[in-house]
Amino acid sequence: METWSVDQVCKWLVEKNLGELVPRFQEEEVSGATLLALNDRMVQQLVKKIGHQAVLMDFIKKYKQGNQELKPTGGPADTSTLTPAQAAPEHEQNPSPTSHGDQTSLYPAVLDNRLIDQRVLKQRRNVKHVLARHKALQWTKSYILPEFPYDVKCMLVEQKRPDHSMRIRIIEFLQADMTKYLEGSLYPTTQQYNDVVNALLQAHPFLDEDGCGFFLWKRALKDRFKYIRRPIEDDEQVMRNKCKFGHRRGQTRKSLADIQSNEIKIVQIKEESAHLDSEVDEHISWFQQEYMKTERDWREVDKRMSQTLEIRRKMIGGQTPLKDILKMFPFLKCPYQMFREVQILTKTDIYKKTRHILESYSENILTAFSVLDNPINTALQEKMKHYTDEGVLKSPEVLKNMKMTATCLLLPHVFGDEPSLFVVVNGKVHVSTPVLEVKNPFHINGCEFSLYLNKEKLTKVDDCVTALAALVSAFRVFGIECPRRLSQTFNFLETLIFDMQSPQFPSLKEKEIRSQPPIT
């Protein structure tokens, strides 16, 4: 490895399922000698993800140990004949005594001409595989927690309840440690998840919150591995495994030929887009110029957006970066154009349907048992009382808008989803998927709604109906998959908006209207 070139190092990274690191290693011109000279701090600067850091350092450490443990051969004459065996680590050449005894009883290890029998080498490789598997099984029964950072250890010693960021740090270190023990594998078994979480809760029982801590920590650990696995979804070996074992239960398995056919279609779409650039270039230039004007010709905008719909859908389906899409078609930032695109694609007036949902389900959601003590509901009650005392709530339309705003903000709470993936109230956006930002939600004149995409403000809207319709439209128009922790809320909305099936509204049987005076 010391004599490897940069290309050889990159090839080795791909073989070790670390192909994501190749561009960075090429940029820094990391050769074999440089790779072996890396220390922990250098690896942290070179590799972003903590899981990849752990795997890379473990591979380097094992190589150095194996290199030091290699024993010199008897003489120069034997060097050429023993080269294949010397290339392997010592434990591969010298398995356990029992295994070695079995091998010598089957085949002579060394022939008369001092050459190693290839059948023996094959048996030794098989023994290595069995030993590695046995080692993994042993690990699952006696897992030892890693050495946590100083601040995490202080929190554990003081038995403080960890906040969200501290939970993430603990999970990251557990995931990195498991990956190291699993020799780079990102697919632990259920038993291995159980053993790790059990070890954590046995060492620190206060983390088991109300007896439900085991399932919460296990789910968080599983989600962390899913997040780490995302960058390798397009890896050739991963695609082969999906093809072999099936990606989802009940899903039709795709052959490798089908996968390659899909890849060819994507390439064809991109090539077709390139050829059509000359035809749509005039439209794109016009869009960019018209978007900068204060008074726009909306009839012409609608006409040209319809003419470029096909190429736009192909580009979005071909995974063209959203920044490029929005640069070429800036009017997609306008809620009206997003609603129009949804109407063309689904034959649905999304604004009208969204308004109907907020009006129809407002009372049910605001009186649902799961949100009675929610801070948003409490803030609504206080503002309504304040405005009533001042005589501001004379218009029924103002009261109706306040209730619909609260309904919009409470949707993920009612369905048990993650609210920060849906709306951020008086805070900062931290997610890349479409999300709403709301400032001063119940202020009659100072309430502000904005739609964010990739942590950047896409557009500012006037009211909660437009905001919610724009949020649902953004996922549809830009082909973005809904986050799993928001699936229940979006299933409810899309079911009603696109008339897919009758939705199941949770917690209506649990609501206790008598525990809170009705909103009038």
UniProtKB/Swiss-Prot annotation:
Alphabetized InterPro entries for the sequence: SAM, SAM/pointed_sf, SAMD3, SAMD3_SAM
The organism's taxonomic lineage, starting at the top: Eukaryota, Metazoa, Chordata, Craniata, Vertebrata
Protein's name in the database: Sterile alpha motif domain-containing protein 3
Domain SAM intervals: 4-71
Pfam family, one: SAM_1
Compositional bias of kind Polar residues: 94-104
Superkingdom classification of source: Eukaryota
Region of interest (Disordered), ranges: 67-104
Cross-referenced PROSITE patterns: SAM_DOMAIN
SMART domains per record: SAM
UniProt source species: Mus musculus
